[in-house]
């Protein structure tokens, strides 16, 4: 087996030019997301890492799924009693990362997370499969449990409880809109001369800068 330090690869799938960039970053993100979804190389194109910090400044990361995006920002849903939600309540500044390795691309976002309204959350919740709706009631996310059987038992209880009719929205389940202050697009380049462009949100629009790799 080779050493990790011996692993090499070339990046040659594409490039990124300043004169081809739109004025608004979400236009480029939409294009890249569409290409990621159409690619057979990515199994979870909507998977993104979200980083938060606790009260001591310790950062944490985890993977969540992007459920929609617009000029306003990026939306995901989660348990409101989870560690990430508690940290967002303390410090709303977060960062997101879409690691589209097989396309030799990544998108890094900084911004602030804003809680969605109950109506907005409900609109999404009712579209989820019933099994997923029930699962939202089962897990006290980030709490310590003795065994997986604890979850299985609770799921069976909730499944029986909600066997008839609709599953109500848990009060502890919600979502966030991450309003971006910066969005960086990275495209792998030959000889490690990668293309990086940073969109910084200003008072009159977005400023675009090329960054050294």
UniProtKB/Swiss-Prot annotation:
InterPro entries (UniProt xref): Pyridox_Oxase (IPR000659), Pyridox_Oxase_CS (IPR019740), Pyridox_Oxase_N (IPR011576), Pyridoxamine_oxidase_dimer_C (IPR019576), Split_barrel_FMN-bd (IPR012349)
Enzyme Commission numbers on file: 1.4.3.5
Keywords tagged on the record: Flavoprotein, FMN, Oxidoreductase, Pyridoxine biosynthesis
Cofactor note: Binds 1 FMN per subunit.
Chemical reaction(s) catalysed: pyridoxamine 5'-phosphate + O2 + H2O = pyridoxal 5'-phosphate + H2O2 + NH4(+); pyridoxine 5'-phosphate + O2 = pyridoxal 5'-phosphate + H2O2
Gene3D superfamilies, A to Z: Electron Transport, Fmn-binding Protein, Chain A (2.30.110.10)
Enzyme class: oxidoreductase
Presence of the UniProt keyword Transferase in the record: no
Keyword Kinase: no
Residues the record lists as binding substrate: 8-11, 67, 124, 128, 132, 192-194
GO molecular function: FMN binding; pyridoxamine phosphate oxidase activity
GO-annotated biological processes: pyridoxine biosynthetic process
Cofactor(s) needed by this chain: FMN
Entry binding sites for FMN: 62-67, 77-78, 83-84, 106, 141-142, 186, 196
Pfam families associated with the record: PNP_phzG_C, PNPOx_N
Pathway recorded for this protein: Cofactor metabolism; pyridoxal 5'-phosphate salvage; pyridoxal 5'-phosphate from pyridoxamine 5'-phosphate: step 1/1; Cofactor metabolism; pyridoxal 5'-phosphate salvage; pyridoxal 5'-phosphate from pyridoxine 5'-phosphate: step 1/1
Family, per entry: Belongs to the pyridoxamine 5'-phosphate oxidase family.
Subunit structure: Homodimer.
Function: Catalyzes the oxidation of either pyridoxine 5'-phosphate (PNP) or pyridoxamine 5'-phosphate (PMP) into pyridoxal 5'-phosphate (PLP).
Descriptive protein name: Pyridoxine/pyridoxamine 5'-phosphate oxidase
Gene field: pdxH
């Amino acid at each position: 087996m080779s050493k990790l330090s011996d692993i090499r690869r070339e990046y040659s799938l594409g490039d990124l030019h300043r004169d081809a960039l739109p004025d608004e970053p979400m236009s480029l993100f939409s294009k890249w997301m569409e290409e990621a979804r159409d690619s057979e190389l990515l199994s979870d194109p909507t998977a993104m890492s979200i980083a938060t910090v606790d009260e001591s400044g310790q950062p944490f990361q985890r993977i969540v799924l992007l459920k929609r995006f617009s000029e306003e920002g990026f939306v995901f849903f989660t348990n409101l009693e989870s560690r990430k939600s508690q940290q967002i309540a303390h410090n709303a500044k977060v960062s997101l990362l879409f690691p589209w390795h097989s396309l030799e691309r990544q998108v890094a976002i900084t911004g602030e997370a804003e809680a969605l309204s109950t109506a907005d959350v409900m609109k999404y919740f009712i579209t989820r499969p019933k099994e997923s709706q029930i699962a939202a009631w089962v897990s006290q996310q980030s709490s310590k449990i003795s065994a997986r059987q604890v979850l299985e038992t609770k799921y069976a209880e909730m499944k029986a409880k909600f066997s008839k009719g609709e599953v109500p929205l848990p009060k502890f389940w919600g979502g966030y809109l991450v309003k971006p202050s910066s969005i960086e697009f990275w495209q792998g380049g030959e000889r490690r001369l990668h293309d990086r462009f940073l969109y910084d949100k200003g008072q009159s629009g977005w400023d675009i800068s090329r960054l050294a790799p």
